[in-house]
Amino acid sequence: NGYVLLGEKTLVPFGSDAEQLLVFAELEGEGPAAFVVDPKQRGVSSTREAFMGLRPLSLSRVKLENVEVSAASKLGEQTPLNLERVIDLSRIGTAALAVGVCQAVLDYTKNYCNERVAFGEPITHRQSVAFMLADIAIELDGMRLLTYRAASRAEQGLPFKRDAYLAQLQAAEKGMKIGTDGVQLLGGHGFIREHLVELWYRNLRAISLLQGSLPV
């Protein structure tokens, strides 16, 4: 006995380079299930897509057209798959990724603004610049604490769905704002590749889309 998989998924990390694919599918009459699929198998195709951010992840579009897999390829025969938990855990990972990128934005822009001199003084002496840096630090701390809380509750075996969602929501909304503010603080330099803030801005924009629409 086996299964036939049919479907298509975008934004698959390393989808064109992976040696094995982990595929989540909805089985007729059974519910969600997970399978390990060989990407070289007949019916499996992948196309690397040029996204504006997260390019090192080699995000790809993977298509499965009547792919036949054996029953042994199905994971968790003894324990039903908790797909919602998998999604919630991935939300925590996405939030943590955003926290790291936002920390890089803060560190870089703070040093730049302290060294950038205009009208005889560092631009951090201007209230508008100092306030923007302070706002980035405040929002980043909020992102980090929500992510820590969600991860801690998950590790302790406590309910964490709400916490994971809030961490993802904060990371997506505030992450994009921090990326935008980082570019803004550098002015014209924020739009050239000599400075990394343009890369982080693109990455944060892409991170906000990894988990799909925020209300989901």
Model-identified regions with their sequence ranges:
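Residue-level signal for inorganic ion chemistry
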Residues: 7, 35, 64, 102, ...
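Conserved hydrophobic/aromatic beta-strand scaffold that supports enzyme active sites
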Residues: 2, 20-24, 34-36, 59-66
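A short core secondary-structure module
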Residues: 8-47
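Solvent-exposed alpha-helices and their adjacent loops that cap or buttress functional pockets
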Residues: 13-17, 27-29, 52-57, 79, ...
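Alpha-helical interface subdomain recognition
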Residues: 2-4, 85-216
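A generic structural signal for well-ordered coil/turn residues at beta-strand boundaries
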Residues: 17-19, 30-31, 40, 56-63, ...
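Acidic-glycine-rich active-site phosphate/pyrophosphate-binding loop
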Residues: 72-81, 194
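Flexible, small-/acidic-enriched active-site or ligand-binding loops
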Residues: 12, 38-74
